[in-house]
Amino acid sequence: MESVKNAKRSYEKEYRQKVCSPVEAAAVVKSGDCLCFPISVGEPTLFVRALAARRHELEGVVINQQHHLCPDYFTEDSAPHIKVNAWFTSHVSREAVQKGWADFVPNYFHEVPRLLRDYWPVDVAGTVVSPMDEHGYFTCSLSVAYTMEAIKKAKKVVVQVNPQAPRTHGNCHIHISEVDHIIECDEPLASLTIPPITPVEEAIGGYISELVEDGSCLQLGWGGIPNSVCKALLHKKDLGIHTELLSDGMVDLMLSGAVNNSRKQTHTGKTVATFALGTSRLYEFMNENPRIEMHPVDYVNYPHNIGKNDNVVSINATLEVDLLGQCCSESFGHLQYSGTGGQADFVRGSNISNGGKGFITTASTAKNGTISRIVPTLAPGASVTTGKNDVDYVVTEFGVAKLRGQTARQRAINLINIAHPDFRGELTEAARRMNRI
């Protein structure tokens, strides 16, 4: 008993010795260093702001990150001092990537930990963590993804301890002995406002819910369509969740009993995710919740792990679909808008799954109905996020197009049938010119 108490006192002493200010932590970074920060809500904002404040003292610092929050170093004058490799562009990094002040790194999300191991040095890693427990462990809280791998490889580790960060279960723990510097803060976590569901999103959610069977295992993203799907699935039974992103709509499914994870072949009884983003309600629900497990992205998003569960249903959004079924979900022509993320991982995982179904969703039009999202060919320079051989279903507010197992001719017909009526004529003419129909 005494040795346990001594260990606890030792952890507390070590913790106190490592506490520092954000400015002191930022002083650890040297010119030429490579840094790695977690996706979105896991970004240690106080550390990042302090680092950005001294950027003109540094040269050739590189930051690798998936999705960014702090805008301070995404400027033309910052690039020689701190250059960002964006693995997924956000509203913060998009302009910098397009103007060459930052770089974009194409990737499959499940491969990021391996890329860290094999290609990218990590001199300093920083992350938000939940408070330390009596055994000396923090958790990565809402952003596990590649965080554990970055910490494992880093020469120096900075954690930002926030009591508002939920303590999560799964493979997401960091011991005090792995940490070099501790920043304490108590600030609200980055959150999202849930927009009202539009009629278009409600229609798409309704079509998908009709094809989701009891006992299915779900992956959904964030936004109006996933929220609409979650609402439409509240009457289902024995659903499971194995997802990249955990969102508010999934909380409703769990609280209603529609999700109990009882029919999953892996992690039976548990909801599995690699990061979470939503409202404070989601974060409160996740805190110390034994029904939710957070695991690294190379496990969660690995297609063959996804496919170990039967009846996987993946639901992902796209920006543009051509008449063969190629989906561009990340760029407008050559202008990078976001990234592949986990879309390709889960589309492939659902294809591997026994009884699995993959849904690619989009409104039929953009820009107030002036542009069709279903097009004869993708725009010049567009990235193919999900290839034609992987796409199963495409869904708009006008219906569902089955593509998997269909001829090129039938694919074109099915896609034209779910395009906006205003564009079906010109799509049909284009398809004939290309000998698609």
Curated annotation (Swiss-Prot):
It catalyses: cyclohexane-1-carboxylate + succinyl-CoA = cyclohexane-1-carbonyl-CoA + succinate; cyclohexane-1-carboxylate + butanoyl-CoA = cyclohexane-1-carbonyl-CoA + butanoate. The active site is at residue 244. Gene3D superfamilies: 4-hydroxybutyrate coenzyme like domains, Acetyl-CoA hydrolase/transferase C-terminal domain, Glutaconate Coenzyme A-transferase. Keywords: Transferase. Pfam families: AcetylCoA_hyd_C, AcetylCoA_hydro. It comes from the Bacteria. PANTHER family: ACETYL-COA HYDROLASE (PTHR21432:SF20), ACETYL-COA HYDROLASE-RELATED (PTHR21432). Homodimer. This is Succinyl-CoA:cyclohexane-1-carboxylate CoA transferase.
